[in-house]
Amino acid sequence: MAKHRSNRLAETLKQEISQLIREELKDPRIGFVTVTSVEVADDLGNAKVYVSVLGDSQQAKDSLDALKRAAGFVRSEIGKRVRLRHAPEIVFKYDTSIEHGAHIAQLLRGVKQEEEKDEGESHDQ
């Protein structure tokens, strides 16, 4: 039961935090940020918010720093928007899964090109 509740809360937090970042946070360092997932502890006291940032590594670092500074504001707004006895402590983390997936796709394309090149050379002989 607790796991089901934390999963529901995680989805709600994902939606609310996404909206907060889009509409309420006015820090110019925050670039194009996407909340990819939220993990809520079983006791509902902590929430890890995973974000991806469109841009280079410096833009990602700046955006993450700005989000970490705004975590208290985000928590207080969540407390107002979501019916909870205590709003969870918010921790922002950079999600590398998109970059990792792009890297794997690039490697697979390279392998496919090598195979096609090898097949072309074997047909020529």
UniProtKB/Swiss-Prot annotation:
Span of the signal peptide: none
Role summary: One of several proteins that assist in the late maturation steps of the functional core of the 30S ribosomal subunit. Associates with free 30S ribosomal subunits (but not with 30S subunits that are part of 70S ribosomes or polysomes). Required for efficient processing of 16S rRNA. May interact with the 5'-terminal helix region of 16S rRNA.
UniProt family annotation: Belongs to the RbfA family.
Source organism (scientific name): Desulfitobacterium hafniense (strain Y51)
Subunit structure: Monomer. Binds 30S ribosomal subunits, but not 50S ribosomal subunits or 70S ribosomes.
Phylogenetic classification of the source organism: Bacteria, Bacillati, Bacillota, Clostridia, Eubacteriales
HAMAP family the record matches: RbfA
Main subcellular location: cytoplasm
GO biological process: maturation of SSU-rRNA
Name of this chain's protein: Ribosome-binding factor A
GO MF entry, a single one: ribosomal small subunit binding
Cellular compartments per GO CC: cytosol
Organism superkingdom: Bacteria
Keyword Plastid tagged: no
Keywords: Cytoplasm, Ribosome biogenesis
Cellular compartments annotated: Cytoplasm
Cross-referenced InterPro entries: KH_dom-like_a/b, RbfA, RbfA_dom_sf, Ribosome-bd_factorA_CS
